Amino acid sequence: MSGIFLLHQTKMKKIAIQGIKGSFHDIATHQYFKGEDIELICCDTFEKVFDEMRHEGSLFALVAIENTIAGSLLHNYELLLESGLTVVGEHKLQIEHSIMCLPEDDWDTLSEVNSHPVALMQCYRFLKNHPGLRVVEDDDTAGAAEHISSRHLKGHAAICHKDAAPLYGLKVLEEGIQDNKHNFTRFLVLTDPWNADLVRDARLCNKCSLVFSLPDDEGCLSQVLSIFSFYKINLTKIQSLPIIGREWEYLFYIDVTYDDYVRFHQSLDAIKPLTRELKNLGEYVAKK
């Protein structure tokens, strides 16, 4: 079931993602919007995703925000805050890597493997066991598969999701080559604030992303966390980023879950006097 509660099921939705068909963003988007009529707007970079959102307010975006191995995508936090977009959902995708090549190639004809640097890092042990393969970084996992296919690069292999193979006419040599089998990426679903209430039911929301800064006073952060604890608000993530141009000052991005919507908003009222620049980035349904 989709994590988004749509009131207009028949209208096709346009979703901006970083990457191309067969990328992990593509796979996560189709899982999240399963059963819905969607059109992908594929962008080379995350900056271009947010540019698309600025130009057309009715769009959605699905953007990776953290990985259980690589950690947080810090720049995406900055892009989210600058954009003014609202978080209306999240999706967690298990990251599974496969190695694929042209149909006429095989292990004994391969000389080079291409993929995104993070994917290559996540397959370190596999690559170490194949020292004959020269490792070359690419901008995108599925993009590496597309390049091999479109340019008919014999002797080249791509590391990406297995779903990219049929899209680009490649054959899978081995699946599940990632070092850690418990590798997950969390994605946020974003849209313009005016569009948010059309696509979610606030009564069902139980998670919120917030950002704030704090004065340089002793114990400020612990006071904020104590207030959340008093109102039985569960902190699921905290991420600090330096504020550019303000030495040793930080923005705190936090995710919280709650059972009582009223008590959650009471907690926000209680922490507001303690914080600076408190902003609600969006309320949505927590995905397990």
Predicted regions and their residues:
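Domain-level signature for soluble enzymes in the chorismate/prephenate branch of the shikimate pathway
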Residues: M1-K288
